[in-house]
Amino acid sequence: MISPLLLGEKAVEDMRNKQPTYTWIKVMETNIMAGGLVGGFGDEYGRTAAAHPIHDALTLRAETHQFLHGVKVAYGVLVQLAMEGKWDEIDRLSTFYNTFNLPRCLADLNLNHLTDNELLIIANRACEPGESIHFLPGEVTPQLVVSAIRNLEKHIY
């Protein structure tokens, strides 16, 4: 069986070469269908709980404005996995992220200079009432988010 991550790599390569190949079409169709199904059937409970609130909170910092939405959401996925203690999954995604220059750490987002207090401002925004980050099991606090970010930093380096 071919790894979906390998198909994604081939699809991006084909897109960059302006070649609408079968692989590219199938990967795009899969993304659109899966996103629609998750959003449609799962509603807010089926979405990546922390990734989008992390994205939204990162936009408080001007240093991140040059990055596309999906790039910041990709970082939010890693923060969520760190919050859940899924380090093997982070390792598995890390190679994939490297292939596409997706951020794995604060330095990749020009944020490696942030203090814990500055990270706490970001975490407070991500943890506002009503944010999907609270769909994660257990109590989600800004301190937990900062801790996950710092632990992710240690894990990546």
Provide a role label for each language-model segment.
Residues 1-99:
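Active-site segments that bind and position negatively charged phosphate/pyrophosphate groups
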